[in-house]
């Protein structure tokens, strides 16, 4: 009801735990289109739901937009899935991509897709730079986590293998050699939490790692701003089939004025200007991770300049309002 009153949006739930383009979902989508006289369709994830695009087109959809993330890369690479993804691209009007890496990987996957370059258009989530903005340390959080006088390295993300939090923990002993007051603040929840706990224990740094858990969107800037450095050494998995789509949290950290240490996986390279807003590292190299973070801690003025440059870059290129207007123009012509 709140979404309807505020945005004019009707939310329709389905009993399926995972929404897939099954005959039942196709049929239900067609009925919803007819009920609300829908002509413009947006698929939040191109694969696999946009396989419904052809059916919806026949039923009256005049403009269909689908957004690609990191996982569409393996849809475009794996032989059988590639055929399905080619069908998706053929059936839609626009395929949104987060950054240049994702665009190029998908375009170069096949001639059939490359011949439809005109359908590709960048659509990024955008950053609310009023929400994600530099701010003084939250005294309550400083007291809660006993951070007074500590050199805080912050990482925000789901606790999953791709995000590379284990590599940060493995790099921590080398960082502590130079900065014994350093501490790693991990924000997020996920299936690798116990593994990360064990890794920290084995490395002898458990007392130097804080597992803050999941925090609300409203509180996230306060957590990010506790850090001097934001680091998340994301990595590619399964022979490059699982990659980081963009890493929006790097941009959120930049908007908060922090230098970012970014892993070289997939579209994460589009979320940093190497040596300007942060440092791009080989996420498989623990020594390189440790060196990048230590260098930023050792040169706080240079780190601050990177953070300031990052905020300026986000304001100029990743503002929520500008991306919202671009998306609305593509979808409904506003």
Language model segments and positions:
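Donor nucleotide-sugar binding/catalytic pocket of nucleotide-sugar-dependent glycosyltransferases
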Residues: 82, 90-136, 211-212
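Conserved acidic donor-binding segment of nucleotide-sugar-dependent glycosyltransferases
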Residues: 273-275, 279-286, 295-301
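Short His-centered aromatic/hydrophobic patch
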Residues: 43-49
